[in-house]
Structure formats: C-alpha cells, structure tokens
C-alpha cells in the first residue's frame, strides 16, 4: 500500500473515532443493544416481489429490519441508504420529519459499514424498487474502519483469506460458496443417515499417529506427561466400533497433517469416514456414487457440472478400472507381467519415474500411476487394485495377492475418495505393520507405526467391513467450482505476515 493510501486510511480512522466521541458526548452508545427484527431484506424481496406500489401503500406494512450501510446519500432533510444483511440489500428512505431531528443527526454522522436498525413501512419507489420508509432509526454498531471499495471488493487474494469477514461482506460469490458448503455437509449427513449409518465422534488426540501415511502434529499432555498426536485419520477408532458391534458408523471431522500447503492441501481439513460391517469395497463404490451424485443434484440441481475448464458428468455408472490396466492404457507398461522388484526399478529408470531406496514393485506401480495417469482422469473413475505395499490396512485380493481390494476415486485429475475392504486378519495386519516399521527405518517417515491396541481389538474379531474416506473440502471445491482449497475454508492456515 502506498504512503498516500496509508495517510488516507489514517485520516478516515481519525474521523470515525471523532464521530464516536461526538456520539458519546450526546449520550448515544455507538455500539448498541439487542434489536428485534421482524423480517430480513431477503424476506422482503421474496414476500413482496409481486406487490404493486398501490397495494403496498394501502397495506401500510410495518417492519423492523437491520443491516450494514453499503451506500448513503443525504440531501438536506432527506436521505437514502442501502443496508445489507448477508448478501441481500434493501433501500431505506429517511426523512428528518419522520424520524426526528436527533435521529436524523445521528444518521448524518453514519458511515459506510455502520450497522443500523430501522423501523418503518414497506413501499415501492417511482422506479419500482422495494424500500422501507423509516419511522425510527437506531445506530447499532459504529464501523471504525472503512470497507473495501464496494465495486471491486478485496483485490488481494491473500487478504481475502486473512480477513475473511471483509471478503464475506464484499464478495457475494464467496458468501454463496460457504452457504453451499454448509448445505453439502447437511445433505451428506442426510444421505449417510438414510443408508442406515450412525454418526459418531472419536478422539482428536491419539497416542499413535495411524490410519494414513502422513506426518502428524505432536503435542504434550502435561498431566499425563506423554506425547500425543493430532489425528491424521479417523479410521482406527471407527474400526474398533465395528468390532464392538456398531455395524454402520460414520464421522465427519477435522484431521491434521503436518505437511505442505497448496491449492489442494491445508494442514487441517475435514474428512468423512464410514465403515459398514458385512460389506466390501464394491459396496462402497456404490455408496460413493450414490452419495456424490445425490448431493451434487441437491446443491446444483443437476449431476452435470463445470469445474474450471472441464465439463464433468457425475451421473452414476462411473468407470471402474484396475490400477495395472489403467497404467498399461496410458503408459504402455504392463505391470501384470512384471515379476520382480528389479524389473520394476528398470522400468522406472526407463520411463523417468523417480523412486527411492525403500520402493518395491507396488510402490513403483503407484509412482507410474501418479506420474502419468492420475491427472488425466477427468470424468469420475474408480481406480482399484492398489498394491499391498501402499495399502497396509486393506484386505489382499484373493486372485492376486500383490494387490488389495482397495479403490480411489478420481475426478478432474484429483483423488476424492479412498476406500477398501478392511483387513480383518490380525496376524496379517501385524505383519503389515512390521513391514511399515522397516520402511520407516529405511527413510519413509510417512510409514505406519505399530498400533498394539488396535491389533488387540482385531483379535476379538472384525467382521468383513467396507471402509471409506472422502475429503470433504475437495468435494466442496468440486461442487462449487472453487480453484483453491482456501476458497472453501473460512479461515485457511496462512503463513505469518512479514
């Protein structure tokens, strides 16, 4: 910001504070009390849209409304202002002889951004605009800082994220997005409830960081003198509930990963995880298709949407393809016929796929997929058959034990869901954890730790179970055409200002 702009802002701050002093000297509280509203600007728009000027004059409907001043014009003993509540504006017509000399003096002191309460009657102007003719004016809160330019809002994208309250005042698209986010969460819960799932809550503080390959945030419990981790997934506690006989459960909650930020990643984000006893990953595919298509239809009125440059059809009957097949399709490498880790490494070298020391056949297949295939999957696609090495909690495939009964959902080149037939063999699970521990020793700091308590729970018997994880934030991005995860998080994590 230039020095000139700084000086202008400072001048406005001084003037507004002087007005506060003036009001207090007159015995008026610039930061008022409760105000009872009988109607909102939006409701006035909706209820009286079809009423003529003459009908409104005859009805003389008295209302009480409140909102933030967005425009103001004063000419002698008459003034006009538009107030905004959420993102609906209403014109207020103010006459000195109608509200009284003292109240009119307060109105003249009002600035853009001030919050006011109005009592009056609804009428329609000569130009046809629904308005309220004020009979009473109340200052409810004085704005000490000027709002951003009403025509351009916040031009600085980072400022929109840091000062979301200003973004919501000045940017209708942003406010609508967060209303849609709320509806998406509601409709998601409605759908899961309709499928017989029970919503539960599980701990945020874990003694072991498990359920996903990610770096945790670490904290310390003073009274117990022990390290705890902010959860990186919801999975392991929810599966304990399946062991306990709660056959269908889900949770929508925050998880935390101590990793980088990007347009798709925030250190804390919202996950939906669900688990259903006596089901498998194919049942979960059906659940995901139904959930996403239903919620999309409810919030957008259609299952055909636009995301950025792409037209996406979320109508059910999505493509289902094995990871090895889709790699062969896009890259021309047939991993079905790769018989050794060494052969896989040679293929990686030949195709410029970056690998590290701990990587074996399954890791390398996944690297091929992520390098050459993932971003090309625009229409909804279930990619299944993930290798055992990268799926420590998933059940092995009976026909080929190199792979698991796991899938990920890809839309517009991004992962939107991860699911599998849960591994319920405690002996196999222990061996998988041990293999993960070896990977950690070789430098894979995202490898899963040993969770003895979870293993003990499995030993009591986990029925065949289909498990699901959906990144709620990415789903909201998709359904609202948001280019960045920060656009759909009210208060995204931001680096300290310099």
UniProtKB/Swiss-Prot annotation:
Positions that bind Mg(2+) 2: 415
Database matches in InterPro entries: Aa-tRNA-synt_II (IPR004364), aa-tRNA-synth_II (IPR006195), aa-tRNA-synth_II/BPL/LPL (IPR045864), Lys-tRNA-ligase_II (IPR002313), Lys-tRNA-ligase_II_bac/euk (IPR034762), Lys-tRNA-ligase_II_N (IPR044136), Lys-tRNA-synth_II_C (IPR018149), NA-bd_OB-fold (IPR012340)
SUPFAM superfamilies associated with the record: Class II aaRS and biotin synthetases (SSF55681), Nucleic acid-binding proteins (SSF50249)
Binding site for Mg(2+) 1: 408, 415
Superkingdom of source: Bacteria
Cofactor note: Binds 3 Mg(2+) ions per subunit.
EC class of the enzyme, as a word: ligase
Subcellular location, record wording: Cytoplasm
Catalysed transformations (reactions): tRNA(Lys) + L-lysine + ATP = L-lysyl-tRNA(Lys) + AMP + diphosphate
Record-linked Gene3D superfamilies: Bira Bifunctional Protein, Domain 2, Nucleic acid-binding proteins
Cofactor(s) required, per the database record: Mg(2+)
Single Gene Ontology MF annotation: catalytic activity, acting on a protein
A single GO cellular-component term on record: cytosol
Protein name: Lysine--tRNA ligase
